[in-house]
Amino acid sequence: MTRTSVLADALNAINNAEKTGKRQVLIRPSSKVIIKFLTVMQKHGYIGEFEYIDDHRSGKIVVQLNGRLNKCGVIQPRFNVKINDIERWTDNLLPARQFGYVILTTSAGIMDHEEARRKHVSGKILGFVY
């Protein structure tokens, strides 16, 4: 089976481990986008600590789960999102107002929609977490 998206596989592994009640999950291969996405999730308390293990191939990430995650996913293709359209995307993707985050990749880095609105930057949509 071919991998279509490394980020989608990583978030799917986290979702499945969270549903089965596991305390940690191993993600491989890793990428810079996955690490930045996990950093945003960790900043908002959806996951615990995570550790990057360099095996001189593609690398591994061990993520500690804390049971707060309901769902996380990837939006394909990565649609362009203007600052005015961020509200529309959050209404479509998230279950309620001020519950969860839409993750964007911008020229200022990977961040959630609230930080992007504060910094007044737009970009492409990566995924969501709640």
Curated annotation (Swiss-Prot):
Keywords in alphabetical order: Cytoplasm, Ribonucleoprotein, Ribosomal protein
Subcellular location: Cytoplasm
Organism domain of life: Eukaryota
One of the protein's GO biological processes: translation
InterPro entries to which the protein is assigned, alphabetical: Ribosomal_uS8, Ribosomal_uS8_CS, Ribosomal_uS8_sf
GO MF term list: structural constituent of ribosome
One matching Pfam family: Ribosomal_S8
Listed GO CC annotations: cytosolic small ribosomal subunit
Cross-referenced HAMAP family: Ribosomal_uS8_A
Record text on subunit structure and interactions: Component of the small ribosomal subunit (SSU). Mature ribosomes consist of a small (40S) and a large (60S) subunit. The 40S subunit contains about 32 different proteins and 1 molecule of RNA (18S). The 60S subunit contains 45 different proteins and 3 molecules of RNA (25S, 5.8S and 5S).
PANTHER family assigned to the protein according to its UniProt record, in alphabetical order: 40S RIBOSOMAL PROTEIN S15A
Family: Belongs to the universal ribosomal protein uS8 family.
NCBIfam families: PRK04034.1
Function, in words: Component of the ribosome, a large ribonucleoprotein complex responsible for the synthesis of proteins in the cell. The small ribosomal subunit (SSU) binds messenger RNAs (mRNAs) and translates the encoded message by selecting cognate aminoacyl-transfer RNA (tRNA) molecules. The large subunit (LSU) contains the ribosomal catalytic site termed the peptidyl transferase center (PTC), which catalyzes the formation of peptide bonds, thereby polymerizing the amino acids delivered by tRNAs into a polypeptide chain.
Protein name (record): Small ribosomal subunit protein uS8B
Organism from which the protein derives: Candida albicans (strain SC5314 / ATCC MYA-2876)
